């Protein structure tokens, strides 16, 4: 297929999508299609419990399996805390590459790099983990109760935002009718056709390159630099193309794992989540609970509105702060509301 180059500038001209022909004919190489010489395949061991301390983890049998080149867990991973969402990179830092505490079913416990994906999967079955289960919460209201067990060391509240305009109390007093109702939105997985995947290369010169369908290559680059203590000049993040993101690939998911394994082995490492791995073990759209109170005149004029929102961050902060700030203001753009 030959693409036609626009002849009369940009405005009012149909612009060709340069990679469209490759994609519709199945020739485009996504990260999951990429291979490099001596490349290893990675698989991740996920937590079967919602919240627990890892009392012990024995990877010795997995390490001895023929074809296994590295096994990583919290014991031999960087201890640096980070926020996986580039928008909040200097915000609340709650994650590690691997942690001695798991905080949701599907949290990362360990990872293996092996000559084949099949060998890596076999190695996962040889890892022995003992968990000390801790309290967990399925509803955000329970996590907010006094005396609730902290999912992280400080508090179960990541951020509280209050925005005001006008005089809500006065507006409600002037209203002819007051309506109150509760609303709830579910957590939704972004469901991109391409699952989370990455391929990391660590050169003997100390340069780290990560290929990933990221929606935030610069945020990923900064995070990887900080996690592994590398100068920014030694870290490169490349997005060769993305098979759908919809916001779900703003956060880092597989990239720190492949980077760590590549640094341990000195060989390229690729990790491709299956669909069954991707949905429980990556990021979802936040679920929310909203209470809305609206004061109105008889002619339908809105004179005051008040909204309380609880945003469910799940196990880690990620981009929650941006969502909280957005929810505290965006709704009131729908209607002219003086208070």
Where are these regions (language model features)?
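General beta-strand structural signal in soluble alpha/beta enzymes
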Residues: 26, 70-75, 104, 179-181, ...
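Glycine-rich loop/linker segments at domain edges
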Residues: 13, 19-25, 87-88, 159-198, ...
């Amino acid at each position: 297929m030959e693409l036609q180059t626009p002849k009369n500038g940009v405005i009012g001209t149909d612009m060709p999508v340069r990679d469209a022909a490759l994609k519709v004919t199945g020739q485009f190489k996504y990260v999951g299609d990429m291979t490099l010489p001596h490349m290893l395949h990675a698989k991740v061991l996920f937590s079967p419990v919602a919240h627990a301390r890892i009392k012990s983890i024995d990877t010795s049998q997995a390490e001895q399996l023929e074809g296994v080149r590295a096994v990583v867990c919290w014991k031999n991973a960087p201890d640096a805390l980070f926020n996986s969402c580039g928008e909040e990179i200097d915000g609340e830092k709650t994650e590690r590459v691997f942690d001695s505490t798991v905080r949701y079913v599907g949290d990362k416990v360990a990872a293996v790099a092996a000559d084949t994906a099949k060998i890596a999967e076999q190695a996962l079955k040889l890892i022995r983990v003992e968990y000390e289960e801790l309290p967990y919460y399925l509803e955000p209201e329970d996590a907010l109760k006094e005396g609730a067990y902290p999912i992280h060391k400080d508090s179960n509240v990541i951020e509280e935002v209050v925005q005001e305009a006008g005089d809500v109390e006065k507006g409600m007093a002037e209203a002819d009718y007051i309506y109150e109702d509760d609303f709830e939105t579910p957590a939704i997985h972004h469901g991109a056709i391409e699952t989370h995947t990455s391929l990391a290369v660590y050169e003997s010169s100390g340069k780290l390159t990560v290929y990933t369908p990221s929606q935030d290559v610069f945020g990923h680059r900064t995070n990887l630099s900080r996690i592994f203590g590398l100068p920014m000049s030694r870290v490169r993040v490349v997005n060769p193309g993305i098979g759908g993101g919809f916001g779900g690939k703003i956060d880092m998911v597989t990239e720190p794992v492949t980077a760590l394994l590549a640094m341990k082995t000195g060989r390229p490492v690729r990790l491709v989540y299956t669909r069954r791995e991707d949905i429980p073990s990556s990021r979802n759209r936040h679920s929310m609970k909203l209470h809305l109170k609206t004061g109105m005149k008889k002619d339908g004029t809105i004179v005051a509105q008040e909204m309380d929102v609880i945003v469910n961050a799940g196990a880690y902060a990620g981009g929650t702060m941006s969502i909280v700030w957005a929810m505290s203001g965006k709704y009131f753009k729908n209607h002219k509301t003086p208070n």
